[in-house]
């Protein structure tokens, strides 16, 4: 097993605020990450957009190949010029099904959109919330 490094390189400028602490924790707790984090220290997660789109993409991509998820996402997102929770709620189920979404995934996307439009998620507070509170909010959404 590789030894725990005494100090990790500084995170890249584009890294989220929590990145250095998360890397430090993972290096201590996971033997694979202990080797990978120093090796890829110039890398960091970056946001791919707003939380609604990120979660919607996650739902679309569940239990399918990356290629299939990408094709389905492309067809689904083409249904709208502006992919927002409110606009998703305006879509017809048949149109979403025609984009390649299963009935269950349509239900999940509608529930996700409802959580956003009804302000049941406190996205703006997530950075200050503890993990358990965020998990509770997210797992209240069907399909998450």
PLM regions and their residue ranges:
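Intrinsically disordered, low-complexity, charged terminal extensions of DNA damage-control enzymes
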Residues: 1-51
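Alpha-helical ds-nucleic-acid-binding substructure associated with the helix-hairpin-helix region
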Residues: 64-65, 69-142
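Amphipathic alpha-helical segments that form the core helices of the histone-fold
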Residues: 55-57, 96
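Alpha-helical scaffolds flanking conserved acidic
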Residues: 20-21, 50-54, 90-91, 132-135
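Generic alpha-helix structural propensity
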Residues: 28-31, 47-51, 55, 67-71, ...
């Amino acid at each position: 097993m590789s030894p725990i490094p005494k100090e990790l390189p500084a995170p890249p400028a584009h890294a989220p605020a929590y990145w250095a602490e998360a890397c430090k924790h993972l290096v201590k707790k996971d033997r694979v990450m202990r080797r990978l984090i120093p090796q890829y220290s110039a890398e960091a997660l970056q946001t791919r957009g707003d939380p609604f789109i990120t979660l919607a993409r996650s739902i679309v991509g569940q239990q399918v190949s990356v290629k299939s998820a990408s094709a389905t996402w492309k067809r689904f997102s083409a249904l709208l010029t502006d992919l927002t929770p409110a606009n998703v709620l305006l879509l017809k189920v048949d149109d979403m099904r025609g984009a390649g979404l299963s009935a269950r995934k349509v239900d999940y996307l509608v529930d996700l959109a409802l959580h956003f439009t009804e302000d049941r998620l406190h996205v703006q507070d997530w950075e200050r919330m503890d993990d358990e509170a965020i998990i509770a909010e997210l797992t209240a959404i069907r399909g998450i």
